[in-house]
Amino acid sequence: MYPLARRILFALDAEKAHHFTLDALNMVYKLGLIPVTGNRTKPVKLMGLDLPNPVGLAAGLDKNGEYIDALGALGFGFIEIGTVTPNPQPGNPQPRLFRVPEYQGIINRMGFNNHGIDAMIQNIEKSKFSGVLGINIGKNAVTPIENAADDYLICLEKAYAHASYITVNISSPNTKNLRALQGGDELSALLEALKNKQAQLASVHGKYVPLAVKIAPDLDEAQIEDIAHVVKSVEMDGIIATNTTIDKSSLGSHPLAGEQGGLSGLPVHEKSNRVLKLLADHIDGKLPIIGVGGIMEGRDAAEKIRLGATAVQVYSGLIYKGPALVKECLKALAQ
């Protein structure tokens, strides 16, 4: 069924197909045609949260929390929405999303296009979803990098009451200078500020919402070691490895190899796994890792768990394989 749908969708502009697919999924869900499945096939504890299974949806598919209920019916163990910023922003000019089917890859330079944190919260409040919901937060493009912490703090405060966990996205390649926040001193200052705010909010709301940070695949071992040291010292609750890569050498002479943006899907598989393995070695079990990047079939999810991840997330694989990928991953993890 999905291979036929994919042929039709891949004939459309990538971004238009993205919105069409989500709208269609939402309509089918509202008509009651998606059998809601809990998929408690492999329960796992992540950052103190009880997941029915370890296969989650990565941020980026539902940027504004408009499709939470429909996505929640597909059997994910957890869902992450965003990236969201304090204020609405249009993102980068179109075209900004490209498929590379020969390599099962996707290039995006979306640029955190979203309706803002207030609109997202309204969508969450309308949702009936009762599962584990992560909110991925970022900074507005117009905010100077030296003031980035202000944007993250605004989003953290507003999202706190509505999230099961919150992810600090400092690794998108499509917001100018954002990845500089992965540097030791910059990272330490940002995460310390967020952890202090987290403690205040936990007291106010009477609940503890875990904080994770999402890192890039384009890091050398020294940088990974520095990040591991910082996240352990500030006592982050989790880390997500990885975001998209800016390295498109795997595409060879493909016409899209020169496009700006982050590359995801199969081409990021090895780079993401390398970071995951090194990170797991340096973290030494002090906090859980969510593995994401290049999961195109069930054995890819199982490989990330073997390399040290507690849970995994998928996105690009869904575009190429459809919702059946979730069950395929769960089957592989159950073996």
UniProtKB/Swiss-Prot annotation:
Which note does the record give on the cofactor? Binds 1 FMN per subunit.
Quick one: where is this thing mainly located? membrane
* Active site per UniProt: S172
Q: Which Pfam families match?
A: DHO_dh
The annotated topology with respect to the bilayer is:
Peripheral membrane protein
* Gene Ontology MF terms: dihydroorotate dehydrogenase (quinone) activity
Its Gene Ontology cellular component terms are: cytoplasm; plasma membrane
Location comes to:
Cell membrane
Cofactor(s) this protein cannot do without? FMN
A Gene Ontology biological process in which this protein takes part is:
'de novo' UMP biosynthetic process
Which superkingdom? Bacteria
Q: Which keywords does the record carry?
A: Cell membrane, Flavoprotein, FMN, Membrane, Oxidoreductase, Pyrimidine biosynthesis
Provide the binding site for substrate: K63, N108, R109, M110, G111, F112, N169, N174, N243, T244
Q: Where does FMN bind?
A: A59, G60, L61, D62, K63, T83, N136, N169, K214, T242, G265, G294, Y315, S316
Query: Under which pathway is this protein filed?
Result: Pyrimidine metabolism; UMP biosynthesis via de novo pathway; orotate from (S)-dihydroorotate (quinone route): step 1/1
InterPro entries in UniProt: Aldolase_TIM, DHO_dehydrogenase, Dihydroorotate_DH_1_2, Dihydroorotate_DH_2, Dihydroorotate_DH_cat, Dihydroorotate_DH_CS
Enzyme class, first EC level, given as a word: oxidoreductase
Spell out the reaction equation it catalyses: (S)-dihydroorotate + a quinone = orotate + a quinol
Signal peptide location: none
EC number, as in UniProt: 1.3.5.2
What quaternary structure, including any partners, is listed in this protein's UniProt entry?
A: Monomer.
Q: Which family is this sequence assigned to?
A: Belongs to the dihydroorotate dehydrogenase family. Type 2 subfamily.
Function text = Catalyzes the conversion of dihydroorotate to orotate with quinone as electron acceptor.
The record's listing under HAMAP family reads:
DHO_dh_type2 (MF_00225)
What name appears for this protein in its UniProt entry? Answer: Dihydroorotate dehydrogenase (quinone)
Task: Give the source species.
Answer: Neisseria meningitidis serogroup C / serotype 2a (strain ATCC 700532 / DSM 15464 / FAM18)
